[in-house]
Amino acid sequence: MGNKFTNISTNLRNSWLTAKSGLNNAGQSLAKAGQSLKTGAKKIILYIPKDYQYDTDKGNGLQDLVKAAEELGIEVQKEESNDIAKAQTSLGTIHNVLGLTERGIVLSAPQLDKLLQKTKVGQAIGSTENITKGFSNAKTVLSGIQSILGSVLAGMDLDEALQNNSNELTLAKAGLELTNSLIENIANSVKTLDAFGDQINQLGSKLQNVKGLSSLGEKLKGLSGFDKTSLGLDIVSGLLSGATAALVLADKNASTSRKVGAGFELANQVVGNITKAVSSYILAQRVAAGLSSTGPVAALIASTVSLAISPLSFAGIADKFNHAKSLESYAERFKKLGYDGDNLLAEYQRGTGTIDASVTAINTALAAIAGGVSAAAAGSVVASPIALLVSGITGVISTILQYSKQAMFEHVANKIHNKIVEWEKNNPGKNYFENGYDARYLANLQDNMKFLLNLNKELQAERVIAITQQQWDNNIGDLAGISRLGEKVLSGKAYVDAFEEGKHLKADKLVQLDSANGIIDVSNSGKAKTQHILFRTPLLTPGTEKRERVQTGKYEYITKLNINRVDSWKITDGEASSTFDLTNVVQRIGIELDNAGNVTKTKETKIIAKLGEGDDNVFVGSGTTEIDGGEGYDRVHYSRGNYGALTIDATKETEQGSYTVNRFVETGKALHEVTSTHTALVGSREEKIEYRHSNNRQHAGYYTKDTLTSIEEIIGTSHNDIFKGSQFNDAFNGGDGVDTIDGNGGNDRLFGGKGDDIIDGGDGDDFIDGGKGNDLLHGGRGDDIFVHRQGDGNDSITEAGGHDRLSFSDSNLKDLTFEKVNHHLVITNTKQEKVTIQNWFREEEFAKTVKNYVATRDEKIEEIIGQNGERITSKQVDELIAKGKDNKIDKNDLANVVNSYELLKNSRNVTNSLDKLISSVSSFTSSNDSRNVLATPTSMLDTSLSSLQFARAA
């Protein structure tokens, strides 16, 4: 039993795979049904091999067939065997009564002769030589076959089908197979040649005027002389009615009322009547054959039938309807915004879902019949006619249904196509799919308007310019593929909005965003003195797209994407003080990917920014950037994103504010633009559309170089950066990480940020703030200022001359502890953090221990200042250390210094000077430092467009 179920399952699967492999996208194959083949669609040839011998003296039946054929207008052709064999082999139509060749439909005289000699017929008529009523019977048989073919192949342009090997050719072959099966089964069911000819003729006459086999089941039931017990035409009628209904539904010229009737026939007669008839019919056949019909046998048959019904098929259909329902709900909002594409997609899902449901129901019934008959016929010799009937008919009907299903799918898809074309015709110059992106963008704008209106306050800018990239949309991609309009679709679209004083402005007159040519111009700032340019979502690289749809297989198409790339974005600013965050501008393009989707070869898009006037801030992204700060005080930030450690070398620069920045981005993930493929299915037609989008991709590391001109400050990364300053005034912030900063010449402002940094001011009057971490600070020559705050850690300071100052900006001097440790002065705050001034006492001690030693180095800090401007000089420190016990300054002595009138009298100028210096570097911080004044909106995390992307059903 297990083997039998396995065989049944295998046969069903093979039948399904065979049917599936034959699907294609032709939508015209079932049109113009109802014309008879006799009227000229393609001629019929009665084929007689040249070497086929028959005895005319004995009245061979073939002679009568020839005469009948000539009278009926059927061409009689004698051909060389090898020529016909070649044609038959090439078209796959061999060993049948009927076949297709390049010259027409061949009626094989030898095969017909063999058919007439089969046991039942032969017993009644003896042999071919004794065909009774010769000519009249021959004419009856040929006329019947001719009529059957006229209906089965109605409307098919066989000339074109034979030339192009199109879908119609496959359908024609299936129709011939159906006719062959009918002829075979009639021959197996009758006992005389008269009956055979009569049945063929009756069937042909019944079908003669039936358009597309419409109501064939009812026609067959009216045939006289058919034995339902032997042929089971109650089931055959239902099956053929199902096929006929499918043909009607696929016929684009059929009326709505006809299609409604056909749908009713599918749902009721096929699914209902056939399913009910299966079990009783099978059991009746077993009784007629003298086989068992007991409970266990009935259970066996029922279980076999149930095995043939796949719940997964119906689950898939349910998914289509659920998807359609979700799409309709989703579409309501976008329809109000001027886009009805989601409704079209829902219409397609419902239409094809209905077709799927109908065809699946029929195929389920077919599979159940095949399985049940196999079980019923087990061990029976007399059941072979029934098995022949089922195997010959159900497989052919299933094939026809599958081809009809594809045609019906294409019919639904064509309606979608036509609606899109009609919309574009009524809206000249507009693109339907671009209109879809517009609607998606407007919906996103509505959803985020409250957040956007608050950006002026949150970003502290009079004007906020928000640039939004609407990326690839799966629903739009599905619609483009289904409608065969993939060449018109875009990978996305960029939009720009402006906000001032909490109001939304039209940005088209304020900002030029040209994605095709790579231009972003925000120079028209109007009355706004400050503006923030915010890229809300990753902006794709500039350029134009062109697509071409090509066929890659019998049912496979791909719409190839060609990009005319522009190698850079050109950003222009004007008089306003502007902030640009470029970390969301895609600069890396994944040209080649490995099987895991990791980037193995890349291309880069440069950013060229001319900032104009104003005090500007630029947050650099992942690729090469050229920035000309122009006038004003301009800062370049590397503190956002994870784009590798900096190496800045300005030692050879000849102009102030000019820097070359080299970066190496280590192996990891970075934002890349890549090309992917979207797949949409229309039955067996597969549409692939290439599109570009951005996401974080694994890469093997890369180098990039930035060129900065007229830049006043540079803020580093979270990595271990190296800064080498110029001979001019430099301003560096190390950010996080263990940074090495060398100011070189000039009056530099150097800030270490987090991490154990090494900072050397070099020549010039430098401002040095180690930030958090245990830092090594060297002032070099010049009048240097050092800053330490509570929480900054343990710093070590080395000085080499000049009038230097150390500010404890948030501590009172009287709360500090001053202590001599070896040659060094150690100052400890209330958090027990220490600032060690290296070699403070070394020169004096050398003078005491080395004869005739002359001090040559000044390694002291001349003034140490508290948060309120109180100060103590290096001379006072030396005196109080010498006076105190254990090499420490006495607290009372220190308090007296703090409270000194003269210090208070002169402190104001000192305090004001230091406050300006300290506040000027307050923005020298990484993005996560509490002292950063250029924050990222926290609510940016809620502005992703991904929430708008509709999730397609599996």
UniProtKB/Swiss-Prot annotation:
<dbReference type="GO" id="GO:0090729">
    <property type="term" value="F:toxin activity"/>
</dbReference>
<keyword id="KW-1133">Transmembrane helix</keyword>
<dbReference type="InterPro" id="IPR018511">
    <property type="entry name" value="Hemolysin-typ_Ca-bd_CS"/>
</dbReference>
<keyword id="KW-0472">Membrane</keyword>
<keyword id="KW-0677">Repeat</keyword>
<dbReference type="GO" id="GO:0005509">
    <property type="term" value="F:calcium ion binding"/>
</dbReference>
<dbReference type="InterPro" id="IPR011049">
    <property type="entry name" value="Serralysin-like_metalloprot_C"/>
</dbReference>
<keyword id="KW-0354">Hemolysis</keyword>
<comment type="function">
    <text>Pasteurella leukotoxins are exotoxins that attack host leukocytes and especially polymorphonuclear cells, by causing cell rupture. The leukotoxin binds to the host LFA-1 integrin and induces a signaling cascade leading to many biological effects, including tyrosine phosphorylation of the CD18 tail, elevation of the intracellular Ca(2+) and lysis of the host cell. This leukotoxin is a major contributor to the pathogenesis of lung injury in bovine pneumonic pasteurellosis. It also has weak hemolytic activity.</text>
</comment>
<dbReference type="InterPro" id="IPR003995">
    <property type="entry name" value="RTX_toxin_determinant-A"/>
</dbReference>
<keyword id="KW-0449">Lipoprotein</keyword>
<dbReference type="InterPro" id="IPR013550">
    <property type="entry name" value="RTX_C"/>
</dbReference>
<keyword id="KW-0106">Calcium</keyword>
<comment type="similarity">
    <text>Belongs to the RTX prokaryotic toxin (TC 1.C.11) family.</text>
</comment>
<dbReference type="InterPro" id="IPR001343">
    <property type="entry name" value="Hemolysn_Ca-bd"/>
</dbReference>
<keyword id="KW-0843">Virulence</keyword>
<dbReference type="GO" id="GO:0016020">
    <property type="term" value="C:membrane"/>
</dbReference>
<dbReference type="Pfam" id="PF02382">
    <property type="entry name" value="RTX"/>
</dbReference>
<keyword id="KW-0204">Cytolysis</keyword>
<dbReference type="GO" id="GO:0005576">
    <property type="term" value="C:extracellular region"/>
</dbReference>
<feature type="repeat" description="Hemolysin-type calcium-binding 2">
    <location>
        <begin position="733"/>
        <end position="750"/>
    </location>
</feature>
<feature type="transmembrane region" description="Helical">
    <location>
        <begin position="230"/>
        <end position="250"/>
    </location>
</feature>
<keyword id="KW-1043">Host membrane</keyword>
<keyword id="KW-0812">Transmembrane</keyword>
<protein>
    <recommendedName>
        <fullName>Leukotoxin</fullName>
    </recommendedName>
</protein>
<feature type="repeat" description="Hemolysin-type calcium-binding 4">
    <location>
        <begin position="769"/>
        <end position="786"/>
    </location>
</feature>
<keyword id="KW-0800">Toxin</keyword>
<dbReference type="GO" id="GO:0031640">
    <property type="term" value="P:killing of cells of another organism"/>
</dbReference>
<dbReference type="Pfam" id="PF08339">
    <property type="entry name" value="RTX_C"/>
</dbReference>
<dbReference type="InterPro" id="IPR018504">
    <property type="entry name" value="RTX_pore_form"/>
</dbReference>
<dbReference type="Pfam" id="PF00353">
    <property type="entry name" value="HemolysinCabind"/>
</dbReference>
<feature type="repeat" description="Hemolysin-type calcium-binding 1">
    <location>
        <begin position="715"/>
        <end position="732"/>
    </location>
</feature>
<dbReference type="GO" id="GO:0020002">
    <property type="term" value="C:host cell plasma membrane"/>
</dbReference>
<feature type="repeat" description="Hemolysin-type calcium-binding 3">
    <location>
        <begin position="751"/>
        <end position="768"/>
    </location>
</feature>
<keyword id="KW-0964">Secreted</keyword>
<feature type="transmembrane region" description="Helical">
    <location>
        <begin position="381"/>
        <end position="401"/>
    </location>
</feature>
<feature type="transmembrane region" description="Helical">
    <location>
        <begin position="297"/>
        <end position="317"/>
    </location>
</feature>
<feature type="repeat" description="Hemolysin-type calcium-binding 5">
    <location>
        <begin position="789"/>
        <end position="806"/>
    </location>
</feature>
<keyword id="KW-1032">Host cell membrane</keyword>
<dbReference type="InterPro" id="IPR050557">
    <property type="entry name" value="RTX_toxin/Mannuronan_C5-epim"/>
</dbReference>
<feature type="transmembrane region" description="Helical">
    <location>
        <begin position="359"/>
        <end position="379"/>
    </location>
</feature>
<dbReference type="GO" id="GO:0015267">
    <property type="term" value="F:channel activity"/>
</dbReference>
